[in-house]
Structures are given as structure tokens and as C-alpha cells.
Amino acid sequence: MISSSVKFLLNDKLIVIKNPDPNQTLLNYIRTELKKTGTKEGCSEGGCGACTIVLGELVDNKIEYKAINSCISFVPTLNGKQLIIVEDLVSQNGKLHPVQDAMVKFHGSQCGFCTPGFVMSLLDLVFQIPHSIIMFLYLFHPGVILLIEVVK
């Protein structure tokens, strides 16, 4: 039986979507229903990464995070998960997340359209790094080399 609602966390707030459209993409939902336009639509087929978001899921009493392409994932995918979008990374006092700060500090964007997707992919990488490891990451993009020091 298909559930008549989708429940997920956004900014530590429980969101309930009643009678969700199973054909609505996460990208469309984020941009039209949540009115958050930081997540971009590029290719609409999961190839460019401009639409990257991060989902958290409780697995064996631990939250596992995974970057996904929101343009090819659908609203029911959110059920029981935590949604993290680029707008959620800035703290309430306006301080940038370390990944965002590094993008600014090292001039890690060009026109800026794909930058939210880069930031979310890097955030996913930060979640995947074991505790207490320092990693230097070189992100190559045409004309740009970004060096980020990630410390957990």
C-alpha cells in the first residue's frame, strides 16, 4: 500500500506532505513548494550536479548522509529522511558553513550557477570523512582549482 503522506525533517522541523504527487521531482518540490531556489536545474537528467542535495537517513542508530540529484529523484524519496539544501548551511547568525566559506575564500566558482551543487557535493564528502582526519581536496573545474582543508 502506498502511503498517503511523506514525512521528513527540514531544519530540524518535521514536514508532512499529504497526498504527495509521486511524479513530482524533489527539485520541483524544493523550488516551488518550499520556495527555496538555491538548488538549480541544469541538465534535468542527473548529469551536471547543479541540483545536488543531501539526504540523511537513520541506519543502525547513525545518520548516514548521501548526495543525490534532485532532478531525477521524486518526493516519496524524502519519507523518513532529513533534507539538507544549500540554503540550510548558513547559520542563523549568517555565518557560512566551512564548505561555503572555503568556496568564497579560494574563489571556487565562476558564474555561480553550479556553485550550490558543488557545495552540496563537498558537504557530502565532509560527512563521509572519518572523524579526526585532515584532508586536502583539490576540486578541478575548468579554470578553477579549489583547495579545501576539512577538519572534523
Model-derived features: where do they sit?
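Signature of N-terminal electron-transfer/Fe-S-associated modules in redox systems
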Residues: 1-152
